[in-house]
């Protein structure tokens, strides 16, 4: 009677206990059967399972526990992310492929790394020796011996339970009893030390978040330093040439400016161009005035020649060269045929006159005239010829005759037709 009352009290206490949230991590080598085991626990068919890339998450209700299991990928490249899930896990489910004896050494090293981690040491671990349905699968004792499981567990002070199972034999309520038994044992151990584990998990999670924030800041600082170093190297490579190009090159202004500012800027540019044109014209006029001076017809003395300007000397030398060229041409013409003597004399006289003629340069013509604006293009049809229309024709005589109108028409002449009605007589 007393034991019955005690059992009733225990049941009442359990019924009043709140639902506890528990997080578990499922790890192991690739192709060990982790995803098939997780799906079988959740109630899904475990066949045709693809390799897990990253992780997958399943949620289930087991008694008074709301369990979340993180199924982590077992490839070599992805095992580095396992440590990110250790802080918030209450326990570990390690799945072993008992039919693959060649990878037992790799499994042993991986398990040792997991249990050695400070955020896993001391937490309960469930080892599932999977694929017992295959031939040549190792038994429970063989798996313990190959993994040196007893030594690892004692060294890291972890409670451990090993269960040989086969994840593909059933799912849901028909799941392998060994899997169900192992999961029940793991949750029972967690429930016995739930408060201590919760406190430890809270502490580890806070430390891990602080560490992640610090790593993020350090990463950002490294990126900033690398960027500054690249910019410094770029500026050093550019050197003074880059600075000179920046100074000499046009300054790129903002293309989106108010229209008033653009108009003022254009007016300033036009004024500068006009000033530049006027300065160029003045300089051209000065040069022409210095170059073009009235020349005297009579030859000057040698003293006057010495006192001439350099421009005048250039003109004289040019004149002499021209006269020599004309003389040489005359000599060539004289050596020609006799038939062209008259034409040669005429050309000779003309050339002699041209070579000995010295005319003063008109100063009025030297002054630059303002350029005449180009004529506007002719309108369309400007070049088409004018249409020459013929004069209006007039009648040769009078169009109206007074004696024509008002007279009756002449009678019609009735002529007998041959073979007519009048000739059809019967005698």
UniProtKB/Swiss-Prot annotation:
Instruction: Kindly list the places in or outside the cell where this protein is found, as annotated in its UniProt entry.
Output: Cell projection, Cilium membrane; Cell projection, Cilium
What residue spans carry the Pro residues bias annotation? 370-380
Instruction: Provide one Gene Ontology biological process annotation.
Output: interneuron migration from the subpallium to the cortex
Known tissue expression: Cilium-specific protein. Expressed in neuroepithelial cells and developing radial glia of the developing cerebral cortex: present in both neuroepithelial and radial progenitor cells. In radial progenitors, found in the apical, cell soma domains of these cells (at protein level). Expressed in the primary cilia of postmitotic cortical neurons during embryonic and postnatal development.
**Listed PROSITE patterns:** ARF
Keywords, alphabetical: Cell membrane, Cell projection, Cilium, Coiled coil, Developmental protein, GTP-binding, Lipoprotein, Membrane, Nucleotide-binding, Palmitate, Phosphoprotein, Ubl conjugation
Q: Where is this region: Disordered?
A: 207-250, 269-427
Listed under GO cellular component are:
axoneme; ciliary basal body; ciliary membrane; cilium; cytosol; intercellular bridge; motile cilium
InterPro entries in alphabetical order:
Ciliary_GTPase, P-loop_NTPase, Small_GTP-bd, Small_GTPase_ARF/SAR
Query: Which portions of the chain have biased composition (kind: Basic and acidic residues)?
Result: 207-235, 269-294, 310-319, 333-344, 391-404
Keyword flag Calcium: no
Phosphoserine (modified residue): where? 328
Q: Which is an annotated Pfam family here? A: Arf
**Protein's name according to its UniProt entry:** ADP-ribosylation factor-like protein 13B
**What species is this protein from?**
Mus musculus
**Gene that this sequence comes from:** Arl13b
